[in-house]
Amino acid sequence: MGVSRSTLRTEEIEEIREVSIFSQREIKRLYKRFKRLDKEEKGSINVEDFNQIPELSMNPMLPRIISIFDVNRDGQVNFKQFVKSLSTFHPKADKADKIKILFKVYDINNDGFITRDEIETILTMMVGSNLTKEQISSIVEETLNEADVNGKGKLDYPDFYNSIGSSGCNAENMLSISFNPFE
């Protein structure tokens, strides 16, 4: 699906339905929206194109999120990757899938652990200058103290998953984006 076409073939729609939460109708409408974003008609979009989506443009984590779904690591996301990424953030998407993505957002170097520096980097991206470095460091320290049950000084996926589940945070809402694929 590298080159942009005006319509999707039925087998392409079915293939995408298998890896997403969207209906056939929603996929067709998402394709129209994708084509509007793909102004150069190259069959893929980049970070700047994603910024044209109002529901995503204000998210300071957007470049990090896109990098997770950019499986080719070329700065481009094709339609299937686009739908799969939006599916993950659908309000009805599986909580465990959302937490896996959130873990990947924090695990910047993709080593399977979230370090103190990675938590600090992500937190800084989220709050900008609204908190001082000292406040951010305090939050990072508290997070590690509560979530790092084995005292490794970093979080593995089970630590992270358990801390999200026990923190009372609602991962379903936190990782949901309400958007209208019918625009």
From Swiss-Prot:
Record: residues binding Ca(2+): D107, N109, D111, E118
Coiled coil: none
GO molecular function, a single term: calcium ion binding
GO CC aspect terms: calcineurin complex
InterPro entries given in the database record: EF-hand-dom_pair (IPR011992), EF_Hand_1_Ca_BS (IPR018247), EF_hand_dom (IPR002048)
Domain EF-hand: 25-60, 64-92, 94-129, 135-170
Gene3D superfamilies: EF-hand
Any Gene Ontology biological process: calcineurin-mediated signaling
Lipid attachment, kind N-myristoyl glycine: G2
Biological role: Regulatory subunit of calcineurin, a calcium-dependent, calmodulin stimulated protein phosphatase. Confers calcium sensitivity.
The name this protein goes by in its record: Calcineurin subunit B type 2
Organism: Dictyostelium discoideum (Social amoeba)
Lineage start: Eukaryota, Amoebozoa, Evosea, Eumycetozoa, Dictyostelia
